[in-house]
A protein has these predicted regions:
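An accessory alpha-helical subdomain
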Residues: 124-181
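Regular, well-ordered alpha-helical segments
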Residues: 45-48, 164
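Generic alpha-helix structural propensity
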Residues: 23, 34, 38, 55, ...
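Alpha-helical structural signal
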Residues: 36, 40-41, 57, 137, ...
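Pre-Walker A-like glycine/lysine-rich segment at the N-terminus of P-loop NTPase domains
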Residues: 1-45
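ABC transporter nucleotide-binding domains
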Residues: 24, 42, 112-114, 136
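Nucleotide-state sensing region of NTPase/ATPase domains
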Residues: 48-132, 141-144, 148
Length: 181
């Protein structure tokens, strides 16, 4: 899948950007603070439904604006066009669409536009602990294996619930609540 064109409105410091890409290689050159990293982050957002640099969606809206929109126009290996749309208004639910059809679950989109980002922060993959390496591998594998992604989501939810119970300091004789949420 090749990203042919991107349209960005009010994303971080990018007020309005329309770019067409070469299918081979694209270079971005500019002074510090011009938005090169934010452009790459917008491309990342279209793949992962979130920013690589800021997990709080509302903080990715340009200062003094109420919303952002990112649209990517792709061509599949078979030559079919695909449009990915993301829009966020402050204090509202994020909209993520493929060919104008909204996703019911964002996890359904993960892996549709495969992407691996390598940055200077990834030096921690080598020098750091195993947690960073596991997280990186989880991201890569989740794009190609939906069952792995769903299992990872369930595992993280169970881990969070376990940690809440451990912090609750329940007396040994007390009955633990059970059931589904």
């Amino acid at each position: 899948m090749i990203l042919k064109r991107i349209s960005i409105l009010n994303y971080k410091n990018l007020e309005q950007v329309e770019l067409e890409f070469s299918p081979k290689m694209n270079c971005f050159i500019g002074q510090n603070g011009m938005g090169k990293t934010n452009l790459l982050d917008a491309v990342y957002y279209l793949s992962f439904c979130k920013s690589a640099t800021n997990p709080i969606d509302s903080q990715n809206v340009m200062h003094d604006q109420d919303f952002f929109v990112i649209q990517g126009f792709y061509v599949t290996d078979e030559g079919d066009p695909e449009e990915i749309y993301c829009g966020l208004k402050r204090r509202q639910k994020k909209q993520f669409k493929r060919n104008k059809k909204e996703y019911t679950r964002l996890s359904d989109h993960i892996g549709f536009v495969p992407l691996v980002m390598v940055s200077p922060a990834d030096a921690e993959l080598i020098a750091g602990g195993s947690e960073e390496r596991r997280r990186f591998m989880d991201v890569v594998i989740s794009q190609y294996d939906k069952e792995y992604l769903n299992a990872l989501i369930r595992y993280n939810k169970a881990l969070t619930q376990r940690n809440v119970l451990l912090k609750a300091e329940v007396e040994p004789d007390e009955e633990l609540p059970c059931g589904r949420r």
